[in-house]
Each structure stands twice: as structure tokens, then as C-alpha cells.
Regions:
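Phosphate/oxyanion-binding loops and surfaces in catalytic or ligand/nucleic-acid-binding neighborhoods
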Residues: 2, 6, 33-36, 122, ...
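A general structural motif
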Residues: 92-94, 119, 204-206
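Conserved interdomain hinge at the start of the Helicase C-terminal
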Residues: 190-205
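Conserved P-loop NTPase-based nucleic-acid remodeling module centered on helicase motor cores
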Residues: 1-24, 225-228, 232-239
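Accessory N-terminal region flanking or inserted into the helicase ATPase core
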Residues: 6-97, 106-111, 124, 134
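Core RecA-like ATPase module of SF1/SF2 helicases and allied nucleic-acid translocases
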Residues: 161-164, 214-362
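A short acidic-Thr-Gly-centered motif at the start of a beta-strand
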Residues: 86-89, 199-202, 330-334
């Protein structure tokens, strides 16, 4: 049956710690209710959603989704967890380790308990001060309520002193938290504030740029692109990488280095018929090596110009960007110096220089 209600459905997002991601509030309400172990109407009544969805419309979606899953014998990831708990068929282990435990939902805590009830020793690692997934159903209170022997790690080997100071000032405002003291590493570090992202000099060093949401990264991409700085967006494929490789292959070919069929095909993809006879690719031996002189003698290759002139079928915007990066001394054969990510998407990461956008608008 069709309800004629539009749902924006996304798959499980591996870049966001494997969390279920959807822009549909109806689906998010249903998912959060299952993670929290509460009824869907209870989650709806919390009014934590942002879209205008009536209770009647929500119930229709919820009932129809259940009917559809039952009709086609379908389950989702959270259903797997609840079915596992009901089955009481956890294997017996000598030792179980649970990491990042502050991010577990109540349903996941129930699953963990069903496992450790049949385990000799269980080690739970986590930090309630790092709990940033409440919005996704994380039950931090269950982490805080755990009993047993506590081993506190009092020395950080990652956090410099100035970052430690501001972090302690912030966590001190959290009402329900486990009291803890820890020491920063010996380096003082540097903490600076800027009015605009463009004011930050990122021409040297490795950088991690963090924003609240993905759409906030798009404007940063444009700014870094215009400056000719080598960067990557963690949530996008680097579309320039193939072109970088073709450029290196072309420059090697001009220097007299042999290249293979795959390299020639890549180069040809950025040339028009004026510079490369595309039909000739089918005559190339895929196991042989080729030099520029041989390709030109056969009239397959018709140019020996510098890459940005020879690659006449490559997007001009990409060509200008790569030329500017090279002028800036960027090492395009290495990984990008600058990584753009969301705060949630980079949890556990580190870098020499970190930029945090304090605009937390949704």
C-alpha cells in the first residue's frame, strides 16, 4: 500500500560510527524509541524532532512500517539486537571487552549485560565526559551507574595544557558526571580564536577542521579550493585523485619513463581526439610498457605539451586548482594535509592543528 507520505531514508552511515542516519523524523523517532527501550509515542511526545509531523501521521507510518516488515519477513539492525537479547543464546566467554561504552544505547546495554552474565571477566572502557551521541540514543546514565572495580587513567598523552584547561572548564558545567582528575601532556600547546575561517593561515602543517554538520563543510571546501590548499572532505570521494595520478604518469612519460596500458588509458581519458586517438587503445598490449616516442610514431599520441595543455578534455576548474596547489608547494603524491569532518565523524582522531567551528546551528 502507498501512504503518499514522503520519507527521506538513508542507509547506515559507516562514516558516522555506524549509526543509523536518516533525514526523516518519523524514522528517527521509531529508531530512537527502540534504542532507548521506550514506546514510539513516548519518544514522539518528547518533541525532540524538528519536522512538522502530526501524531496521526506518525502512527500511520509506524504501523505501516511494521506491517511491511512482517509481510516481507524483514528486520533492521536494532531488531537483530532485541532478538538476540530475547533468545538468551549468548556464547560463554572467558573475557569480554566493551570499548567506548559511554556511547551505548539502553538496548545495547541490555545486549552487553546478556553477554557478560555468561562471562567470567568483563572490562568496560569509556569516559562519560566524551559522550557526544545522546542525540543518537546513547544512554550515558547507564554507563555512570556501572559498579565494579574502577581503574582511572590519570595521564593524557594527547592533550596539551591549554586544551586541558578549557576542557576542564567546560566539563565542570555538566551536572551528572563521574568526578575525575587527569593530567595533560607536558607541552603547553596553543589556543587561538579567529573571527573568520579565512583568517587562519593553513599553508603549512597538518590540519583537522571540525564542524557541527556536513553542510557547514561545504563553504569551507570553497574557501580552501580558492586558496589552492590540499584538502579532503571525509565524507566525499577525492575526485581530483585520479587526475593527480594521470598528471604524474604524463610527466613521467615526457621524461622517458615507460608506462603501461592502465596509465595510458588514464591519460587518454583527459585528452580529446585532437591529442589522443582513443580508438587506438584496443590495439595496446596490456602487459607491455610504452614510451612517448613509440606512441607518437604510431600516430596514437599527438602532443607532448605540458600536462595542463595536453589534458584538453579535463575540467578547467580542476586544472586551475591543481596548478595553484602546485604553486603553493603542496605535495600531491601524499595524503591531503587538511581534513574536513564533523565533530561526531572524527571521534577518536587527532592532529597537530585542529580548527573547531563554534557555530553549532543545526
Amino acid at each position: 500500500r502507498k501512504l503518499k507520505i514522503k520519507l527521506d531514508y538513508h542507509e547506515y552511515d559507516n562514516n558516522e560510527s555506524g549509526l543509523f542516519s536518516t533525514n526523516s523524523d518519523a524514522l528517527r523517532i521509531i529508531q530512537l524509541a527502540k534504542l532507548k527501550g521506550i514506546k514510539p509515542e513516548e519518544q514522539y511526545n518528547l518533541q525532540q524532532h524538528t519536522q512538522d509531523i502530526t501524531e496521526t501521521e506518525f502512527r500511520r507510518i509506524y504501523n505501516e512500517l511494521n506491517r511491511y516488515k512482517k509481510e516481507f519477513n524483514l528486520i533492521d539492525f536494532t531488531d537483530m539486537i532485541t532478538e538476540f537479547i530475547k533468545s538468551d543464546k549468548s556464547p560463554n566467554f572467558d573475557v569480554v571487552f566493551i570499548d567506548e561504552a559511554q556511547d551505548l544505547s539502553r538496548t545495547q546495554w541490555n545486549m552487553a549485560k546478556s553477554i557478560w552474565d555468561k562471562t567470567k571477566d568483563t572490562y568496560i572502557a569509556g569516559d562519560d565526559d566524551q559522550a557526544i551521541f545522546r542525540w543518537a540514543g546513547a544512554d550515558v546514565d547507564s554507563f555512570i551507574a556501572q559498579t565494579g572495580r574502577v581503574m582511572k587513567l590519570a595521564q593524557s598523552y594527547r592533550i596539551p595544557q591549554v586544551v586541558h584547561d578549557i576542557a576542564m572548564n567546560i566539563v565542570g558545567r555538566i551536572k551528572n558526571r563521574l568526578p575525575k582528575e587527569w593530567r595533560p601532556k607536558m607541552q603547553k600547546g596553543l589556543l587561538s580564536y579567529h573571527q573568520e575561517f579565512k583568517d587562519i593561515n593553513m599553508r603549512e602543517g597538518n590540519w583537522l577542521v571540525l564542524a557541527r554538520t556536513r553542510f557547514m563543510l561545504e563553504d569551507l571546501e570553497k574557501q580552501l579550493h580558492s586558496q589552492g590548499l590540499y584538502f579532503e572532505n571525509k565524507f566525499k570521494t577525492n575526485k581530483e585523485q585520479d587526475l593527480y595520478t594521470a598528471i604524474n604518469d604524463w610527466e613521467n612519460l615526457r621524461k622517458g619513463v615507460d608506462i603501461n596500458y592502465e596509465q595510458i588509458s588514464r591519460i587518454a581519458s583527459y585528452m580529446s581526439q585532437n591529442n589522443f586517438e582513443k580508438n587506438s587503445l584496443k590495439y595496446l598490449d596490456k602487459d607491455a610498457g610504452y614510451q612517448m616516442s613509440g606512441l607518437k610514431e604510431r600516430m596514437w599520441l599527438k602532443t607532448d605539451k605540458v600536462w595542463y595543455e595536453a589534458f584538453d578534455d579535463a575540467p578547467q576548474k580542476k586544472i586551475r586548482y591543481i596548478r595553484r596547489m602546485r604553486e603553493n608547494g603542496e605535495k600531491l603524491n601524499s595524503s591531503p594535509r587538511i581534513t574536513l569532518s564533523t565533530i561526531h565523524g572524527v571521534k577518536g582522531g587527532e592532529q597537530d592543528n585542529v580548527v573547531l567551528l563554534t557555530d553549532l546551528s543545526r
